[in-house]
């Protein structure tokens, strides 16, 4: 050994590094430079030497030169390019922080070293997520703006327990999968703080699966995304939106007297479109939609899913970005502005929220870390054959934390007033849409999905605890008992449930020729057998006007006059019937055609007087609902309803009384004649003597009808009828519903 070689060996030994260690380190650095699974924090960044100095290593493929500088830009040490491409090494003789000065071919960058920072995620948060805590997941995962000491930046964090390696790639590192490998934490979580990253860059995670495949995945907890069909996540802005809806939020009290609930269901991308047939942005929607909803006196807007989704033709019901508003309408702040404007206008906002399934797009949740993670591994549990989508594994706490965190995020961050949970029936039953042998029984041998039941209860429990007064509405199409019953009583704890049975029965009845209706009268009356078993919403939703059925008006029988008359009579019957109301956009003015998600509603139809008449009627129905306690205070209580005429199938007449069960206000009588013949001198029993006034008549010329009615005011006769002490003798116009109210 030469004298020089001996000196080199002594230097290395003084630094605490042996020849064998150098060889091992070279292999590690080579693996790191090749993007292979290596503990990056074990080799990159500053590491103490035996003599008190620090060795600094940086991986910067493509850099031409590098130095270490202080906060004022003074050079502290020059970094040497090692034999391994992209790896720079240097010795730092002073204590304290340092920055990197990196010379790239087209720029000089001065930045802190990401690998000089300690962990930024509290281990307790990770343990809480592993126990199913959605609030902890909201605080921990995704791209979060944080400050490490005096250095601002973004902490990226993701759950990928089967991964060998995870790296952040994006606009800030040239999408180079080698540059920024993340730190592995307990429970399969990965994190990395990138200093000085601001809002706006696109990013993804490069996930190395157990078999070595590198998967480019969007962030499951991204708060912002780029515009589809592009699939990257976007670093969001800081949470600085200035809300002005304090008065609205303060009155959202579940203990208050029941209020009217009338929901206008909207697909934001097709309610109206711009001159280039593109969806409106949130500010434009606010300018146009909010005054329209105010004009029609709806209490709430319900948005079809606006969580980010790759395929517009799914209407939003196959989402992948459960924490991000779709970029189709602009920025997340734009959506916040929309909700804020709704609240200032006195309108609540409900979001359709999908926790039943997700699509299998390569950039999404499917096989997120190379293995079944969010979904079940067994397709008998993990795949919806009806929709070719994947089912969440509700038995995995991290998955339920992900879903719970999403629900809480929308309610908290965007001040939403309710969630309508989609496809609940598909969650509750393991054999939903499956033949014998295509599903796996639960632990007790049954068909119920016990894990999904537990998740739904936890969802409703947490929303009620953290955000009292927020609605949770189940789209549940079976007879599962107690959907809206208290969890303590064995129920699921939803505030409301869609009444799919009422919708199917009554629509089927209305689609029949009036001459045939006498034989199907029970389709009108059967819903009252169970109307008070749950807190129901009566839904005429988007599902009723697609797949060739035509619009609601187009489904009515007869010539044009009869179609309009049928529609008006049906809507007024619906508004008088027990249950809260939901109407999909377009039905309020009588759209003829199927709803088309790729174009605007047929607003030109409002040039026709009959279409304007339907629109005027809907506004008047909502106004009547708002000012009539008998129509809403007892809408979920049997004490608020009495039959007058339930059995006149021959004349297709239905008549009932609505009361305020708490004794306020005056009763309302609703009578529907669903034949094409007027009925004169028709006796109907009522509970109160004196004058009754016709307050609404769908056959009014005001709405496009023949203007047959009861001249405003009638007096009762002291003759018992239909179980009531008094009766009214009425003129019932054809294909019409009338409301009469006792005078005080």
Curated annotation (Swiss-Prot):
Pathway: Glycan biosynthesis; glycogen biosynthesis. Its EC number is 2.4.1.18. It catalyses: Transfers a segment of a (1->4)-alpha-D-glucan chain to a primary hydroxy group in a similar glucan chain. Signal peptide: none annotated. GO terms for molecular function: 1,4-alpha-glucan branching enzyme activity; cation binding; hydrolase activity, hydrolyzing O-glycosyl compounds. Keywords: Carbohydrate metabolism, Glycogen biosynthesis, Glycogen metabolism, Glycosyltransferase, Transferase. Monomer. Belongs to the glycosyl hydrolase 13 family. GlgB subfamily. This is 1,4-alpha-glucan branching enzyme GlgB 1. It comes from Xanthomonas oryzae pv. oryzae (strain MAFF 311018).
């Amino acid at each position: 050994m030469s004298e020089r070689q001996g000196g080199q060996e002594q230097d290395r030994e003084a630094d605490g590094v042996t020849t064998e260690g150098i060889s091992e380190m070279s292999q590690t650095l080579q693996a790191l430079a090749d993007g292979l699974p290596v503990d990056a924090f074990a080799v990159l960044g500053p590491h103490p030497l035996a003599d008190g100095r620090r060795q600094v290593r940086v991986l910067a493929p493509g850099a031409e030169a590098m130095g270490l500088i202080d906060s004022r830009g003074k050079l502290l040490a020059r970094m040497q390019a090692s034999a391994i491409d992209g790896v720079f090494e240097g010795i730092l003789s002073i204590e304290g922080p340092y920055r990197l000065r990196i010379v790239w071919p087209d720029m000089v960058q001065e930045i802190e070293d990401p690998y000089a920072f300690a962990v930024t995620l509290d281990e307790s948060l990770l343990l809480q997520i592993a126990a199913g805590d959605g609030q902890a997941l909201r605080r921990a995962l995704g791209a979060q703006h944080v400050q490490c000491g005096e250095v601002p930046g973004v902490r990226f964090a993701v759950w990928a327990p089967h991964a060998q390696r995870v790296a952040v790639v994006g606009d800030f590192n040239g999408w180079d999968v080698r540059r920024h490998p993340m730190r592995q934490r307990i429970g399969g979580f990965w994190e990395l703080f990138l200093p000085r990253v601001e809002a706006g860059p696109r990013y993804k995670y490069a996930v190395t699966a157990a078999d070595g495949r590198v998967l480019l995945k969007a962030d499951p907890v991204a708060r912002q995304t780029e515009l589809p069909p592009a699939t990257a996540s976007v670093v969001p802005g800081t949470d600085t939106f200035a809300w002005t809806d304090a008065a609205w939020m303060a009155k959202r009290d579940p203990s208050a007297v029941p209020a009217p609930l009338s929901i206008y269901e909207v697909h934001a991308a097709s309610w109206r479109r711009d001159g280039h047939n593109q969806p409106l942005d949130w500010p434009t929607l606010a300018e146009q939609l909010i005054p329209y909803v105010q004009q029609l006196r709806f209490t709430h807007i319900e948005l079809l899913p606006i969580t980010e989704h790759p395929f517009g033709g799914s209407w939003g019901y196959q989402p992948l970005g459960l924490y991000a508003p779709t970029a189709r309408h602009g920025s997340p702040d734009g959506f916040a502005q929309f909700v804020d404007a709704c609240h200032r206008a006195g309108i609540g906002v409900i979001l359709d929220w999908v926790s039943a399934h997700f699509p299998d797009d390569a950039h999404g949740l499917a096989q997120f870390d190379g293995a079944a993670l969010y979904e079940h591994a067994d397709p008998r549990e993990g795949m919806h054959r009806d929709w070719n989508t994947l089912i969440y594994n509700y038995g995995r706490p991290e998955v339920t934390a992900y879903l719970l965190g999403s629900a809480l995020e929308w309610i908290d961050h965007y001040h939403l007033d309710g969630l309508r949970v989609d496809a609940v029936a598909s969650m509750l039953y393991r054999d939903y849409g499956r033949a014998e042998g295509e599903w796996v029984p639960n632990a007790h041998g049954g068909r119920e999905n016990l894990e999904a039941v537990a998740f739904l209860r936890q969802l409703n429990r947490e929303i009620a605890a953290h955000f009292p007064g927020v609605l949770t509405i189940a789209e549940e199409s079976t007879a599962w008992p107690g959907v809206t019953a208290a969890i303590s009583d064995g129920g699921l704890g939803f505030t409301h449930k869609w009444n799919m049975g009422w919708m199917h029965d009554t629509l089927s009845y209305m689609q029949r020729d009036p001459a045939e209706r006498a034989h199907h009268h029970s389709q009108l009356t059967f819903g009252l057998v169970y109307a008070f078993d749950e807190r129901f919403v009566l839904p005429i939703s988007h599902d009723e006007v697609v797949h060739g059925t035509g619009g609601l008006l187009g489904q009515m029988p007869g010539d044009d006059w009869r179609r309009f008359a049928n529609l008006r009579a049906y809507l007024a019957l619906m508004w008088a019937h027990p249950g809260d109301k939901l109407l999909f956009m377009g039905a309020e003015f009588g759209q003829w055609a199927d709803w088309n998600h790729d174009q605007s509603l047929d607003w030109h139809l409002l040039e026709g007087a009959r279409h304007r008449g339907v629109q005027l009627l809907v506004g008047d129905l909502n106004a009547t609902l708002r000012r009539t306690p008998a129509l809403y205070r007892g809408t979920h209580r049997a004490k608020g309803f009495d039959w007058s005429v339930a059995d006149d199938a021959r004349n297709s007449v239905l008549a009932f009384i609505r009361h305020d069960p708490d004794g306020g206000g005056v009763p309302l009588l609703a009578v529907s004649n669903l034949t094409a013949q007027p009925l004169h001198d028709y006796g109907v029993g009522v509970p109160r003597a004196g004058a009754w006034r016709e307050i609404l008549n769908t056959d009014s010329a005001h709405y496009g009808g023949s203007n047959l009615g009861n001249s405003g005011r009638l007096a009762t006769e002291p003759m018992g009828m239909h179980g009531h002490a008094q009766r009214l003798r009425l003129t019932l116009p054809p294909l019409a519903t009338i409301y009469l109210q006792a005078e005080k």
